[in-house]
Each structure stands twice: as C-alpha cells, then as structure tokens.
Amino acid sequence: PIPISHPNQGRGYRFEEEGRSFVFLTDNELTYRHPGGLEYEDYQTFAENADLLVHDAEYLPEDYLLTRTWGHSVYTDAVRLALDAGVARLGLFHHNQDRTDEAVDGMVDDCRRIAAGRPLECFALHQDMEIAL
C-alpha cells in the first residue's frame, strides 16, 4: 500500500498477478500534499507500467479553484499521472455526483485527446463495471 493525499488519509493499492498489474488510487489529490501524503513522483513510481490505473478524477479544472485541499484530483492530473507512469489503461473514478453522464463522457473525450498518439486507453468507470486485465 501507499499513503494517499487526502485530509482523512487512507491507502492506495497495487495488485500484481500473472504478469498483470492494477493500481487503485482513489481520494488522492495529486497537486496538493496533505499530511501523510506523498509527492507526485511517488505516485508516478507506484503506478509505473501498470496495466490498469483507477484514479480519482472528481473535478474539472474550473472546479478545483473552489475545491483545492479537499482531497480529490482534477481528471487532467490523473491523465498526466497515467502518461508519466507509462500506464496502459486509465479508469476515471470518483465522479462528482452532480456531473451528468454527458459531462463525464466529455471528460473521457478530453482525456483521449490529451493522450492522442500515446499508448493510453482512457475510460470512465461506472457502477457494476467489470474490467478484465
């Protein structure tokens, strides 16, 4: 486990089996270091070359002006982490409950635009979703 950057603290996890890896980092604010949290580079190293990264992507950049220090990330920061860590697939997670499905789809489209030309698959997680590694 790895400490996450959140006011209530917590842990992120990396699971590896049969040559596949899954990293789970929810409630993790990448651009603000809460007590007990780590530096961006530590999360990058933890997620390095993962087959799947599930990361907190609650906010839009404009939301973050009002929510900085709340313990959640802007979706574009999650994409940057996935790209910097060489992750194969990024699942956006912990969507803002006020965000419409269409708005989440727009976030995914933007993630794909940001990652264009690089080997990163972006998608939004939803309730009851199952993912094969």
Show where each model-derived region lies.
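Metal-dependent phosphodiesterase/nuclease catalytic metal-binding core
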Residues: 1-93, 104-110
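Short, solvent-exposed polar/charged micro-motifs at secondary-structure junctions
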Residues: 10, 131-133
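Short acidic, glycine/proline-enriched helix-loop-strand junctions
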Residues: 99-129
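Conserved short loop/turn motifs at secondary-structure junctions
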Residues: 96
